Amino acid sequence: MRLHKNLVLAVIKVLDGTFNQQLYADKTIEKVLKFDKRWGSRDRAFIAETSYEIIRWKRLYTEISESKSPFKYNELWKIFSVWAILKGITLPNWPEFNDTPNRRIKGKFDTLNKIRKFRESIPDWLDDIGASELGDKNWEKELSSLNKQASVLSLIHI
């Protein structure tokens, strides 16, 4: 996959609106998608899917990128670069990606992947409640099930 700067900038705008300005993700995405009418369905899908995925895995990605809220502009780029590296996407030679430590990101991901609250990207309080009420073994299964993407189901009424 090749990254295009205008699409990455759109994702960064969505992340800024959602993380820093506390706006709803769907409203922010809707607003950003109106910026450029030339974007096709694939471009729009990339912006929406990437934004939602980064928002979903915020805790893991911010821990790997060592970013703290409120996020500065360069920290949002770091979070995006963590997403791209973990997806196996080669980062372009843009100034925003010059200091990206690929190996350290992958190493930190491997380390954090062993800790449930980071692996599943959930808050500490939720992890504590789930583990105490369901037990560690059942909570692990429940969390992994919750993080699987739902299959598409279509119903046809005749």
Predicted regions and their residues:
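Class I Rossmann-like S-adenosyl-L-methionine
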Residues: M1-I156
